[in-house]
Amino acid sequence: MRVRDFLENGFHLVAGDGGLENPIEGVYICDLLSWVMAKSKPKNAWITIQSHVNIVAVALMVEQSCIIVSEGVEVEREAVERANEEAMPILSFPGTSYEAAIKLYQLLSK
């Protein structure tokens, strides 16, 4: 599965369209950036409610496939700009992180 596949299933692209072909092998859900850096794995879709520019730096450091900002949280302009520069996809999801995780589980289990 690739980031692009999520766009047809309730997720909306906010930034980083240069990374839409990134492969996704798993999902990680966390809002504490230091915890994500320590525990997440490369090629994960990272679900968070954080929306500031530092999420892009963390996602790049851990080699995430994309960032999914749940709860309909608006992503800050600086984060959008940085994600576009780095080709790190940021997707939005209107539901809870739990609902996003269920949706991703269903998609990745196909």
Summary of predicted features, one role per range:
Residues 1-4, 96:
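Short, structural beta-strand-to-alpha-helix junction motif
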Residues 5-27:
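An N-cap/entry alpha-helix motif that binds or orients negatively charged groups
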Residues 21-24, 33-45, 49-110:
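Feature captures the catalytic cores and cofactor-binding loops of soluble hydro-lyases/lyases
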